[in-house]
């Protein structure tokens, strides 16, 4: 049964991709959705057996690579982390498939779309079920490929082409780093399977590697390489630039990428490698700092975005920062808990945004909306639930996980943890502000939409409303019901799938923090909500005066330009690489030196050589015999064959030649 979890999505991708034109749109969508739904049911059975019955399972299918000392088995590992990810991935994938039946129903290429979605799901399942790093890398590359295909689904749009190429190239940086990590793991442990590597981690805790005459702890090096891969895949600061542009794909793709698949891959790899990270303190320090900066950075950019989907995209980037710095302070269980909660309310937000965009004739600018509460009441209620869960409103799913991450950071008595707490709290304020701003600009006030568009706006049909309702229920209740299992003191839910050294465990301290510390993030979030309501509801006439102020105008430009990351990369990397590629390499080497020394010299040499050879065609047999003799002599000198044997052969040949000439 466990094998069906991988086999059915692959079969769905194969059938819809190769036979979709014979099955019609209706048949293709039903087959793909049914296959993924069946897989989702199996995933819940696996979740029950592995997590509740404490029965982790590992399957070995056979040898994949068997070369000298490198032996690699193709196997599947079903532990608690895998079981949770199976439920998250397949639940989101199921609702996205059903949602796409209505949302993409008008598209003539829906067969290809369904095939890509199923293939995306398959590769994510390969990643989370792998029992070794090489097999994990197959899934890692697969989700990268499928993200390229889905972002570039409407391939006639130039912006979609650019966004897909950008996502692919940025993720190549992380992929190269993952390859370095894999090579280092095999060179150190002489194995790549999780069981062997993790069992030997403590042995190499103090081993070093020399890089440019600098001794670096080998586990620090491996974990930093793994983390750089996670930075690219999970859109952390520095390699985050592909994520907002990924909004060029269809909205269901955005929900699948940002909620359950590609961006969570980096978090899963870090959590599965917790045994290595616990013995790599420098790597944990870097993880904490980068995650905290990302959480704050992305939240500040979300304050000034006007594109509906990009606001939600930057909120994803910010929430991923929370998960990353939770891993950095050894809160792997809290990170997985927040990943689970975030998946459902973020999918709800994206699919609700798709419902709004669909009803507004593909309009995404919030400044051209407004007043949609009366015409889209159901979609508004779904958006409200998702936004409140995102900002951490009490007793919704985001409240339990995000606040506990901040409590855990406060309870870790280290400088980097308190740094993460400060930036995380500021990010919580910004998150609340832009979440309420999104609701006010989209659903309240007077409409700024074109009259014809506004009059034709309609609420979500059944195939869109159904998935939204399921996600809304999960966004409300999953955090409460999952809390004690995932992060409760003394819980054995993870059953050894996550490793935390006792010196790094601050869960008990976080449970007994003062009430003022626990309530502080909630107060900050409510303050952000109130400020957004005051500015965008009661004081809208003062917005222009605020932007006329030089300080606020420069601040707005700075945030709207995304902290000038795109400008920095364009001027320092893109332009220099383009200049270097064209001027020295293309014009001097390719068109100059290589062209002269290569084709031109070769053609001239061959032409002169052929003329010289043609002059040797005298028609006299003894001339040809002389050439033959000289050539054969040269070959004899250059060869290692016995010289006397060749002399005998040469004598016999000349005997027959001269005998024939005398005749």
Where are these regions (language model features)?
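Predominantly late transmembrane helices and immediately cytosolic-facing juxtamembrane segments
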Residues: 346-350, 418-459, 466-470, 483-487, ...
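Alpha-helical transmembrane segments
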Residues: 13-17, 97, 299-301, 438, ...
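Membrane-entry segments of alpha-helical transmembrane domains in multi-pass membrane proteins
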Residues: 1-7, 23-34, 70-88, 126-139, ...
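Aromatic-capped, Gly/Pro-kinked transmembrane alpha-helices
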Residues: 49-63, 67-80, 489-523, 538-663
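Hydrophobic alpha-helical membrane-insertion segments
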Residues: 34-51, 174-186, 383-391, 467-487, ...
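Hydrophobic transmembrane alpha-helices and their helix-loop junctions in integral membrane proteins
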Residues: 92-136, 145-455, 474, 480
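Membrane-helix interface "capping/anchor" motifs
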Residues: 21-27, 104-109, 303-310, 642-644, ...
């Amino acid at each position: 049964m466990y094998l069906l979890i991988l086999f059915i999505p692959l079969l769905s991708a194969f059938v819809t991709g190769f036979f979709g034109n014979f099955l019609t749109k209706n048949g293709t969508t039903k087959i793909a959705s049914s296959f993924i739904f069946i897989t989702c049911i199996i995933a819940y059975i696996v979740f029950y057996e592995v997590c509740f019955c404490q029965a982790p399972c590992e399957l070995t299918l056979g040898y994949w690579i068997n070369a000298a000392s490198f032996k690699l088995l193709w196997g599947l590992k079903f532990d608690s982390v895998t079981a949770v990810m199976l439920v998250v991935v397949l639940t989101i994938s199921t609702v996205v498939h059903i949602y796409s039946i209505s949302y993409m129903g008008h598209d003539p290429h829906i067969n290809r779309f369904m095939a890509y979605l199923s293939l995306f799901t398959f590769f994510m399942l390969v990643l989370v079920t792998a029992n070794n790093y090489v097999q994990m890398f197959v899934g890692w590359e697969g989700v990268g490929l499928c993200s390229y295909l889905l972002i570039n689904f409407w391939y006639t749009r130039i912006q979609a082409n650019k966004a897909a190429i950008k996502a692919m190239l940025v993720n190549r940086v992380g992929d190269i780093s993952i390859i370095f990590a894999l090579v280092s793991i095999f060179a150190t442990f002489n194995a790549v399977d999780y069981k062997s590597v993790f069992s030997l981690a403590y042995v190499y805790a103090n081993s070093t590697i020399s890089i440019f005459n600098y001794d670096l702890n080998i586990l620090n090096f491996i974990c930093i390489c793994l983390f750089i891969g996670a930075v690219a895949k999970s859109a952390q600061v520095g390699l985050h630039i592909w994520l907002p542009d990924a909004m060029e794909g269809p909205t269901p793709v955005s929900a699948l990428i940002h909620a359950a698949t590609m961006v969570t891959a980096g978090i899963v790899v870090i959590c599965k490698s917790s045994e290595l990270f616990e013995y790599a303190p420098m790597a944990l320090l870097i993880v904490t700092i980068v995650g905290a900066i990302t959480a704050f950075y992305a939240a500040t950019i979300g304050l000034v975005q006007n594109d509906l989907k990009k606001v939600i995209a930057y909120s994803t980037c910010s929430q991923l920062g929370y998960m990353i710095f939770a891993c950095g302070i050894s809160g792997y269980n809290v990170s997985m808990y927040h990943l689970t909660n975030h998946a459902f309310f973020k999918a709800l937000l994206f699919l609700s945004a798709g419902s709004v965009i669909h009803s507004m004739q593909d309009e995404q600018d919030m400044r051209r909306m407004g007043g949609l509460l009366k015409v889209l009441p159901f979609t508004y209620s779904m958006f409200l639930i998702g936004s409140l869960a995102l900002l951490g409103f009490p007793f919704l799913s985001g409240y339990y996980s995000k606040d506990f991450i901040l409590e855990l950071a406060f309870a870790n008595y280290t400088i980097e943890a308190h740094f993460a707490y400060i930036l995380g709290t500021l990010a919580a304020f910004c998150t609340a502000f832009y979440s309420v701003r999104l609701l006010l600009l989209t659903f309240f006030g007077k409409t700024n939409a074109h009259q014809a568009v506004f009059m034709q706006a309609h609420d979500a049909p059944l195939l869109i409303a159904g998935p939204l309702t399921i996600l809304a229920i999960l966004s409300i209740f999953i955090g409460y019901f999952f809390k004690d299992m995932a992060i409760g003191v003394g819980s054995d839910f993870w059953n050894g799938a996550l490793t935390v050294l006792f010196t790094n465990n601050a869960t008990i301290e976080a449970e007994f923090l003062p009430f003022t510390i626990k309530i502080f993030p909630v107060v900050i979030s409510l303050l952000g909500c109130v400020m957004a309501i005051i500015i965008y509801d009661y004081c809208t006439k003062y917005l222009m005066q605020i932007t006329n102020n030089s300080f606020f105008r420069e601040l707005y430009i700075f945030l709207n330009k995304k902290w000038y990351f795109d400008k920095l990369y364009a001027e320092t990397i893109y332009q220099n690489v383009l200049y270097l590629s064209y001027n020295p390499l293309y014009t001097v080497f390719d068109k100059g030196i290589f062209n002269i020394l290569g084709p031109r010299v070769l053609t001239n040499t061959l032409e002169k050589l052929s003329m010289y050879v043609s002059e040797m065609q005298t028609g006299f047999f003894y001339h040809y015999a002389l050439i033959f003799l000289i050539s054969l002599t040269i070959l004899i000198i250059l060869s290692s064959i016995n010289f006397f044997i060749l002399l005998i052969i040469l004598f016999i040949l000349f005997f027959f030649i001269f005998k024939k000439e005398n005749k």
